[in-house]
Amino acid sequence: EEDDDDLDEVDDIEDAEAHAQDLAQLAEKDPEFYKYLQENDQELLHFGQGEDEEEEEDEEKEEEEDERLLTMDMLQQWQKSLLRHRSPRALRRLLLAFRSVLSSHDDVVQHAFHVQDSRVFSKLIITTLKYMPMVMEYHVPYKKTADGRFKVQTHTQKWHILHRPVRSYFMSVIKLLQTLPEADMVYVALNESAKMVPYLHQDRRVARDYVRALLGQWSSGKDRIRLAAFSCLYVTTASALDDDMVDFCLKSTYHTLIRNTCNTKPHTLEHIALMKNTACELFTLHADASYQQAFGFIRQLAISLRNCLKLKTQEQFQTVLQWPYLHCLDFWSLVLAKTCHVDREQGVPSHMRPLIYPLVQVSLGVGRLVPMSRYFPLRLHVIESMLRLIQATHVYVPLAPLIIEVLESAEFQRRGKGATLKPLDLETTFRAPAAYVRTRIYADQLLSLIHISEP
């Protein structure tokens, strides 16, 4: 648990770095932030040059007199100091207040500040999220390398002083993402914290906690939040400094995806598709790590299928005949279709191409696992995944036997009985109810889906 002393050292570089902020340069260098000031803090663009540190001293006295009650005037004074001087002293106070309001319900923690006005609360959150990247980039600039990583000068005195505030910032952002219900505020937190990712990887434990918080937002909420969370996750994975962090990001993302496929219903299908399509992007970033993770997970699928065929117990069948397993097959077909796409390879085989054969073997085995007509929807799901792989990679997959067995089954060889049943939602069905067997409506739906699936 942190205490206020963690942020004390930031005062040490205040005097050396104080200078007037050139707003014209700010508008040119960071137009997005300048636009934010124009729209939300117009008064900060017109503060007088005669204002000096005496105002800050007055604020300190007010803080003591009011028992550190945070007011809008105090917050605006901090904003001015951050804009004019990139003031580490003002940054320290801002982060203390940020941490205090986010842990206000924790009676064990001694709070440096407290807030009574909801407007001040919102302003504090937005100010911290918006100003922190600006101040850090000024004091500890970074460079982006060709491989997508960030090079931060971690051997400087400034970083030695500011690395604890960075840790405090991310711990507060993590708490915000886990507890704040306002979607708009969460969206801002995701977008702004992404700008701080270059400084994140210096603390592995905090980086992992941040990834977990991102995955929580990626797997729930509205699409806008999901996409913003994934954008942060993508940058975090791409810029990871070591293989352990890359593996953690890939594994955690995959496990989060699979957990969210258990409840495959019409109203969840769109979200699952979004998660699969975005998670697929992570496996295009680091070739070696992606191959190792994909190899391990496809091997697990193969072992589950082998145990099912060998032991033939109900428990083993249930391991394979469930939505998470089918979504795993579909996800890896997405990954391999993307990483091994002929247009992407341009004559140079992808490092992932050797995984196509084992995935195809497992998929075909699952497709023929249960020959009963009730499981034809499962077979058609497998066929759809394999067709995607065929079209992208131009590999040969013997799908004809799977399709012919369906067409030669009793569902089509006998005249189907009429029924007043509603059409099945085959996208969210892998086993048809017994009432649909030998019915005209079921046969028509299967035939329609086979026709659509033909390349």
Task: Please provide the spans of the model-predicted regions.
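Charge-rich, low-complexity intrinsically disordered regions
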Residues: E1-L269, A273-P377, H381, L389-P455
